[in-house]
Amino acid sequence: MKSLALALLVGGAIASGPQQQVLREPVDDPQAAETPLQKISDIFGHLSEQAGNVWEDVMDKFPDTLMDAITQTPPPKKHNRRPDSQWDHIVRGSDVQAVWVEGDAGEKHRKVGGRLDTYDLRVKAVDPSNLGIDTVKQYSGYLDDNENDKHLFYWFFESRNDPKNDPVVLWLNGGPGCSSLTGLFLELGPSSITKQLKVKYNEFSWNSNASVIFLDQPVNVGYSYSSSSVSNTQAAGKDVYALLTLFFEQFPEYSQQDFHIAGESYAGHYIPVFASEIMSHSHRNINLKSILVGNGLTDPLSQYPHYRPMACGEGGYPAVLSSSSCQAMDNALPRCLAMIQACYNTESRWSCVPASIYCNNALIGPYQRSGMNPYDVRSKCEGGNLCYTQLDDISKYLNQDAVMESLGAEVSSYESCNMDINRNFLFQGDWMQPYMRVVPTLLTQMPVLIYAGDADFICNWLGNKAWTEALEYPGHDEFAAAEMKNLTSLNHEDMKVIGQVKSAGNFTFMRLFGGGHMVPMDQPEASLEFFNRWLGGEWSAKSP
């Protein structure tokens, strides 16, 4: 959930902030006399003349608050590590890494690839009766990267149906920097949280026919913590690979089932990269069969041109913005696309950060200032930067001592989104990176589903359809030419149409009617149906 959370703040800040002086009055202290551009150069390294010109231009509208955002270092999250005796299982990555096996041809190789010796996995068997979230078997705990003092929290729910045979799914929320426990309690998990902080059973939970792992990543998100940080998608992928490898080592009974990665929003960055990391290891215990990305940000160059149409009445819903605002967005688009293209060409922070700042201000800022919900064009923002008051209820629930004790949480407090992480990813240039470039290889290895609720603005269905049709890969022409067909529910006698779908080879795009940024929250029954049908192989959910 919540892709572009900081981007909205950046867009609004630039648009509403006063014009800043790039050069300040002379002072005696040379350090104090540095221009903002020089300070950024000190942080990022050498600045080329071309990049400097771009930054000078962008920083004409760069408020002091953003300079503070670049340079500030957040304090580590307060935590209290529990003794090993309080955990039911501890898997040592060094032990797993030391295991060698013999191949069919007699050659010896490590049982699983990748560097694991710095990692441990701690596991707590959660008593279902303590919290009442679900009656199924549950595990929670931490992946520890001892070398870098990183600790990722996870919560596993077994399938309600047939856990010995049902697939296993990893769920990831976005942000970057938002907890996947938001997905658990607001969208697709076994229960939601009421305003009275009581649990309410969800009959349309995605663990109806699959076991689901909810992971708080990267570090310092949700119950996760670290004295260090992760500020790019590729680094986060190493941690996720280690967690899954050690989890399936501890629980081999789940490692034989099909495994899928699903998520939304900034997970459009995460999931292709994480899947690529997994598949890069020829010897692995992760039986990855497909990926699913909902309302994701994956190819900004193809997606950003569709902010204006979605905000201005061309996405299936009434216009939110005035004609003058729409024209201003049109006017800004060519420069935005040129800056994104420069980011694609260099994959450098110097090019990618200005592209994020300029484009988010020009194309997202106008919508943010409208007061409408960027995650659902049908409603106003309810308050706060993330527009959903339910997030406060979830945070209050997860901050209760009894809940934290039941789960083995080690942090002093829980927050749904960590804006420090969001900022770090933005200013590392991760935002505009062309991560769709790894998708063509994935399509040779597994089916890929891109789905989108059609009422979302921030990662809208128009942009997601556009990038799937623009993707350069051998099956491009066949997919681009495929028709959008009605997606009809099989659960209703009246053959209710719940969306549209197009599919060719291993690539599928799906539009879900009446869903916002969080489809499982807005359309719980329809989301569970398409999820089950995807896992069942109706489209391409069988590996070639």
Curated annotation (Swiss-Prot):
- Check the UniProt entry and state the signal peptide residues, or none: 1-17
Q: Which reaction does it catalyse?
A: Release of a C-terminal amino acid with broad specificity
Predominant location category? other
Q: Does the keyword Isomerase apply?
A: no
What role does it play?
Answer: Vacuolar carboxypeptidase involved in degradation of small peptides. Digests preferentially peptides containing an aliphatic or hydrophobic residue in P1' position, as well as methionine, leucine or phenylalanine in P1 position of ester substrate.
Q: Which Gene Ontology cellular component terms are annotated?
A: fungal-type vacuole
Q: Which UniProt keywords apply?
A: Carboxypeptidase, Disulfide bond, Glycoprotein, Hydrolase, Protease, Signal, Vacuole, Zymogen
Query: Where is the protein found, in the record's own terms?
Result: Vacuole
What's the protein name? Carboxypeptidase Y homolog A
- Which residues are annotated as pro-peptide in the record? 18-124
Family membership: Belongs to the peptidase S10 family.
Q: List the disulfide bonds.
A: 178-417, 312-326, 336-359, 343-352, 381-387
- Glyco sites are at 209, 506
One GO term (biological process)? proteolysis
| Catalytic residues, chain numbering | 265, 456, 517
Documented EC number(s): 3.4.16.5
Q: Which Pfam families match?
A: Carbpep_Y_N (PF05388), Peptidase_S10 (PF00450)
Single annotated GO MF: serine-type carboxypeptidase activity
